[in-house]
Amino acid sequence: MSDKPAYLTRDGRARLEAELEELVTKGRKEIAERINAAKELGDISESGEYEDAKNQQAHLEGRIREIKSILARAQIIDEENGSNHEVRIGSRVTVRIDGEHEEETWTIVGSTEAKPSEGKISNESPIGAALLGKRPSQQVTVETPSGTMKLTILNIQ
């Protein structure tokens, strides 16, 4: 696992803690019951049910390790004390993309919370990384997988 910080909002941390609790309590119990039920059916060497349950167990344990690692490296973003002078993780940024009339508003979050469809972009994404440290009215050129974009920062919250 990585040693770099995992930037999370307070809500993001709470969601991960709730997911971890669910996986450790209910998830493990349900899979253990499925494994035991498959064993009771007899020969497990050719049991698809047993193999499926063991695969799900491995997936669940991997997710538990991943969440524990993220929480251990968590650095909480204080969204309420943000600066409107410079883009940072936790900032809500409104931009205009050159050649378009509409404005886009994104919140810069850590990679574990990124959901572009909800307007949350990672600080590690090309756009998120290019916006960090910039100020209102600055123009930014970003190389993305779909080509070069030119953005003008209109507002930072």
Swiss-Prot record:
Gene3D superfamilies cross-referenced by the UniProt entry: Transcription elongation factor, GreA/GreB, C-terminal domain, Transcription elongation factor, GreA/GreB, N-terminal domain
Keyword Transcription regulation part of the UniProt annotation: yes
GO BP: DNA-templated transcription elongation; regulation of DNA-templated transcription elongation
Pfam families: GreA_GreB, GreA_GreB_N
Gene Ontology MF terms in the entry: DNA binding; RNA polymerase binding
Domain of life from the UniProt record: Bacteria
Cysteine pairs bridged by disulfides in the record: none
InterPro entries: GreA/GreB_C_sf (IPR036953), Tscrpt_elong_fac_GreA (IPR006359), Tscrpt_elong_fac_GreA/B (IPR028624), Tscrpt_elong_fac_GreA/B_C (IPR001437), Tscrpt_elong_fac_GreA/B_fam (IPR023459), Tscrpt_elong_fac_GreA/B_N (IPR022691), Tscrpt_elong_fac_GreA/B_N_sf (IPR036805)
Coiled coil: 13-75
UniProt entry keywords in alphabetical sequence: Coiled coil, DNA-binding, Transcription, Transcription regulation
Function noted in UniProt: Necessary for efficient RNA polymerase transcription elongation past template-encoded arresting sites. The arresting sites in DNA have the property of trapping a certain fraction of elongating RNA polymerases that pass through, resulting in locked ternary complexes. Cleavage of the nascent transcript by cleavage factors such as GreA or GreB allows the resumption of elongation from the new 3'terminus. GreA releases sequences of 2 to 3 nucleotides.
Family: Belongs to the GreA/GreB family.
Protein name per UniProt: Transcription elongation factor GreA
Organism the protein comes from: Roseiflexus castenholzii (strain DSM 13941 / HLO8)
